[in-house]
Structures are given as structure tokens and as C-alpha cells.
Amino acid sequence: MSLRMRFKPSIENFVNLFSFSCLSFLSHEPHVYLKKASLFGSLSFVSLVKTSFGLLEINLLVAATVIHLIAPTLFEAPTTHLLEWPATVYLIMLGLRIAVLLAKQLLLLLLR
């Protein structure tokens, strides 16, 4: 299976991307949007990549991102940082997993 066949954009993923961008514009603090700008780049990539991740894992990514983005804007208490950490750790681990899978696929393509 080639790497190209692993990329399967779907309507649901584009809807998720649209909701991410809406959430970013609803954020009333500009520094929150700037701080999370790099997150959106990786999310657009993650949303379009359908590898061995199921729909459940993509939905967990959506939930983690929503918590990560709107928790600081909804509540102005120090406890919101506790909500951000699990989402951040999950996104980092998911990003590493995707990087390993893509590197593995690329290596398999090069060795053929």
C-alpha cells in the first residue's frame, strides 16, 4: 500500500477543521489564538490523515483540542491549567505516533 493511498479526506474531518477555526476566532484573547496557531497546522494534517487511527481516536483528538482551546477562555481560574495538560500530553503523544507511522511507511516505500 502506497503512502498516497493512506490519505483519505472526509467530510467529517473538514467539518472538524471548520469548527476548530470557528473556535479560534471566538477566542476573545488574541494571545490564546497566537499561542495555539501551531496546533492548528498539526490538526489540519491530523484531520486529513486516516492511517490506522479509527474514528474514535480522531474524536478524542477533537475533544482534547476543544478543552485545550476554550478552557482558558471560559474560566478565568488557575484550575484551567489542569485541564490543558492532559490535552497537551495527548496531542504530543498522538503527534509522535503519527510521525512514527509516517516514517515507517516512508521507509517501507524506500526499501521496495
Curated annotation (Swiss-Prot):
It is a multi-pass membrane protein. The keyword Transmembrane helix applies. It comes from the Eukaryota. The chain crosses the membrane at residues 55-75, 91-111. It is found in: Membrane. Keywords: Membrane, Transmembrane, Transmembrane helix. GO terms for cellular component: membrane. Partially overlaps AIM9. This is Putative uncharacterized membrane protein YER079C-A. It comes from Saccharomyces cerevisiae (strain ATCC 204508 / S288c).
